[in-house]
Each structure stands twice: as C-alpha cells, then as structure tokens.
C-alpha cells in the first residue's frame, strides 16, 4: 500500500507537529517526512561522500535513526535542525571510517545531481569546446578543494552553498553561535579563494 502523499498532511501542520505523530507510532506521518526530505538528504550525503550508492545508503540510515530516536524528539527543536544533526553525525562517522577508501575519480561533472536529477555543471550549447573544457576544470577544482577542507568547514560550506541554509540554521545544526558559524564559513571560503587563486596563477 502506498504511503501518504504530501497533500494528505494538512499544510497547516509543521514538521514538528508531524514528528509528534511519528513519536506516537504513526507510520503514515513518518512516510510523509521521508517523502518530503529524502531527496534533500541524498543530495547532502552525496556532497559529503561523493559516492551515489553510499549517499543512498546513508540517507536511508538517517531516516532509520530518526524513527529509532523518535521518543527523544522534543517539539521545541526545529525538525529540520534535528534531522541535519543526525545526518551530520552520520556523515562525519562515515568520513572517518572510509577516509582511506575514497578514490579521487568519484567527482564527475556529468553525473546528475542526486537531489534534483539535473546536471547544473554542464555548459549550454553556446559555449565553445575550449570554454566547456575550462569550465569543467574549474568546477572539478572547486569540488576537489571543498572536499579537501577540514570536515567541519566542508560541512558548513555544503549546508550554506548547496543546501541553502542560513547562518542561524547551520549554527543550530552544528551547535555553534551564529558568530562562530560565520567565522567558520569565512575561513572556509577564504581558504578556497586562496587555493583557487594560487591554482590560476600557476597556469
């Protein structure tokens, strides 16, 4: 039997209210949250581990942990923040456990985005072959440099740049003050800027 569509949960309900239904054992409410956040979680995990199969598995594990931890959820906590805390902890553990296994060639520009199915890095037909090659090189370098950041900086950049989360949301997920979050992102972006400028100057 298919789970509930998004329209079956009244829009007036917040995610926190839906999660309270999950807390009481309402499986249809849990299915609703999975449907709503699955693409987002797969996209986040893909950007953290750069492996499509691992991203799917990690996203599934996030939701398993959400269900197993449902009794500990407090409605005072924003569901999105609680969800990303679970996801970031899982991503950090996965990165630690697989740091010697990650091949360099996992980043591919022609792979569809794990969240949207789009290929945003691919240039349009108006670009010359040389421009396309330069764009591919630049995007590969940016992704490579993001991947090389310290884990907390990388996580903050991914949430800020790709998940479109603001400073307050990132701060809540990472249990930092907003000023500390801004400093963390500033250092990360400054490192990326310096590395990319150095790369350009060598060419």
Predicted regions, residues:
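Sigma70-family region 2
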Residues: 23-24, 50-51, 63-78, 97-99
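Helix-turn-helix DNA-binding module
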Residues: 140-180
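Structural recognition of an alpha-helix C-terminal capping motif at a helix-to-coil junction
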Residues: 43, 57-64, 77-89
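Arg/Lys-rich amphipathic alpha helix in sigma70-family domain 2
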Residues: 71-75, 85-107, 135, 198
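Acidic, proline/glycine-rich intrinsically disordered inter-domain spacer in sigma factors
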Residues: 8-9, 13, 114-144
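Short helix-capping/turn signature of helix-turn-helix
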Residues: 36-39, 47-50, 139, 158-165
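Short, charged helix-capping/linker segments at alpha-helix termini
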Residues: 3-8, 23-32, 42-61, 178, ...
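Amphipathic, Lys/Arg- and hydrophobic-enriched alpha-helical face
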Residues: 34-52, 69, 146, 191, ...
């Amino acid at each position: 039997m298919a789970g509930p569509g998004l329209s079956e949960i009244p829009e007036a309900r917040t995610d926190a209210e839906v999660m309270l239904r999950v807390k009481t054992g309402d499986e249809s409410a849990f299915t609703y949250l999975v449907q709503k956040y699955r693409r987002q979680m797969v996209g986040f995990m893909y950007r953290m581990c750069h492996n499509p199969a691992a991203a799917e598995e990690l996203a599934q594990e996030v939701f398993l942990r959400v269900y197993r931890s449902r009794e500990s959820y407090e409605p005072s906590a924003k569901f999105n923040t609680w969800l990303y805390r679970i996801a970031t902890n899982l991503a950090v553990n996965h990165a630690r456990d697989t740091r010697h296994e990650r091949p360099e060639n996992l980043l591919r520009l022609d792979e569809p985005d794990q969240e949207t199915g789009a290929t945003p890095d691919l240039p349009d037909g108006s670009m010359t072959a040389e421009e396309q090659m330069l764009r591919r090189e630049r995007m590969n370098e940016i992704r490579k440099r993001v991947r090389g950041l310290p884990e907390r900086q990388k996580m903050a950049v991914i949430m800020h740049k790709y998940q479109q989360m603001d400073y307050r949301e990132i701060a809540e997920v990472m249990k930092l003050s907003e000023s500390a979050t801004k400093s963390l992102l500033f250092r990360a972006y400054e490192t990326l800027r310096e590395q990319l400028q150095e790369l350009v100057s060598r060419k």
